[in-house]
């Protein structure tokens, strides 16, 4: 399988690159900075470019099987929302995918993005409330990404996480689609593992699993 990863230099992104290569995937890692990813492998291609450079984005996207984003917003507590660079990146990626393919798109978010399956519980409601109060720009990024995803023509999956700071991987991970009880904490390793496995899960198309440690 040929996969392109945006956000490859982040902590979750680097884990996902490593896991994908170990699984035999051909990986294209998109980075905004050269020499930012200290991984070498015969099946790894690194493309350096801006997140709004349509030429570079097209080079990274076309003729792949699945596109994955682990891009995340800056957690600023400033009340004024000036711009939404991560949402703008999603807009560009989605636009190119709709024009040239592929159709399969996975992105990382929080339960600030709501799923139609969501029922009232802590994991589906608290993240949105806290983000709106504490991180206005992050909240605005998530809501705009939600709008872009839900109105796209892609076969998308949104993997939702809360507090990916758990140091142990526990006994693996579980997911809730929002309609069953979920938990608040997850390790970055398990987030990456879930996203990798989601590339093979057609049953998660147009779903928003919340992943958490067992």
Residue ranges and their predicted role:
Residues 76, 111-117, 164-167:
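Conserved catalytic-site region of short-chain dehydrogenase/reductase
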Residues 119, 168-173, 198-207:
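Glycine/proline-rich active-site loop of Rossmann-fold NAD(P)-dependent oxidoreductases
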Residues 3-23:
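N-terminal Rossmann NAD(P)H-binding glycine-rich loop of SDR-like oxidoreductase domains
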Residues 144-167:
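Conserved beta-loop-beta element that borders a ligand/cofactor-binding pocket
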Residues 156, 201-214:
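Core catalytic loop region at the nicotinamide-binding pocket of NAD(P)H-dependent oxidoreductases
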Residues 26, 34, 88, 92-137, ...:
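Conserved Rossmann-fold NAD(P)-dependent oxidoreductase catalytic core, especially the SDR/UDP-sugar
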Residues 4, 35-92, 96-99, 199-203:
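NAD(P)H-binding glycine-rich loop region in Rossmannoid oxidoreductase-like domains
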Residues 86, 141, 159, 186-196, ...:
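Substrate-positioning beta->alpha
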